Amino acid sequence: MIELIRYLSVNPVLVFLPIALVFAIFLRTGSAPERLARALFLFPFGIGRLAACARVFFFYEETNSLLGLDPEHFQYKIGLADLGLGIASLLAFRKSFSFCLGTAVFAFIFLGGIWIGRLLNFLAGLSPVESFWTLGAKSFLLLLLAASLIFWHRKKAGKA
């Protein structure tokens, strides 16, 4: 079980992006950018963040060694933020554009903070290369989400 949770949370692009793309094709409502945004909220940002939360809460020793960190109480704050983002993303899957946009802002702020922290740790030699790979994957997912929301809004504005 730990290997599955570890793989899901460390490789979000490899695992969840193909699932999200296939799922977006089979969604029947909305434009293509809307379907892509909803699928991204459901899989990498919803289920992926819940897997990251489970890893932080239940497998903290393995998580800390993977990231090169000492065990500390701060990890539980990260786990709660992962839980919040995961739940908000699952809700965004079925909610309005405004709710999706608010959830995307939450994702950008939270994951952007993680990105900056890991980059600084990596540059200081405190984090292994594996944790740096996840930054690129998360950055790609954030850019894909931003693009899908922009095109969703443009399509929506064109219909009004």
What name fits each language-model region?
Residues 1-21:
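Hydrophobic transmembrane alpha-helical segments in integral membrane proteins
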